[in-house]
């Protein structure tokens, strides 16, 4: 997909970064995670779900390969240099957190929540907490647990897969 993903990424900054900008450098992931996730959305839209999943997997691997990434919070209130927050956590992990969120709430609620966040915060500074409020308003669910675990915490999901083969079928 090459250059197309770069274009999708930069175009998404018209909304996440320009229409609503980060409240501070610690909140830059709100801009960059959406721009990163737009690459998956574009691949899925233009080439189909398999290509979107492939883009998502590639970005996940970029996060997992980064030394020390698992110990960094997505939203980092303390950093030595603002450039420190432009990394695989803010971009790649952030995009994967959005993908998990989309799967949790469903496409309809996910995209309505994004619209709500952008509408409520247009021409202002936003932060992860504003995004949570938009999701809560649309879904009617308390999303504090999700934000506390994924936006304000470090680490990544540990997945255990068990197979049971019966008659040659998994």
Where are these regions (language model features)?
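Hydrophobic alpha-helical and helix-loop surface patches within well-folded domains
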Residues: 1-170
């Amino acid at each position: 997909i090459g250059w197309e993903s770069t274009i999708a990424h930069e175009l998404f900054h018209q909304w996440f970064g320009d229409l609503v900008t980060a409240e501070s450098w610690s909140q830059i992931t709100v801009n960059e995670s959406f721009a990163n996730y737009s690459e998956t959305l574009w691949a899925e839209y233009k080439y189909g779900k398999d290509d979107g999943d492939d883009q998502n997997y590639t970005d996940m691997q970029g996060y997992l390969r980064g030394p020390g990434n698992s110990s960094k919070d997505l939203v980092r209130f303390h950093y030595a240099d603002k450039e420190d927050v432009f990394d695989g956590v803010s971009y790649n992990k952030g995009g994967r957190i959005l993908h998990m969120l989309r799967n949790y709430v469903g496409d309809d609620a996910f995209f309505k929540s994004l619209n709500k966040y952008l509408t409520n915060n247009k021409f202002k500074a936003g932060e992860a907490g504003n995004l949570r409020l938009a999701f809560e308003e649309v879904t009617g669910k308390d999303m504090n647990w999700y934000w506390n675990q994924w936006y304000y915490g470090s680490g990544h999901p540990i997945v255990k897969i068990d197979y049971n083969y019966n008659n040659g079928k998994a």
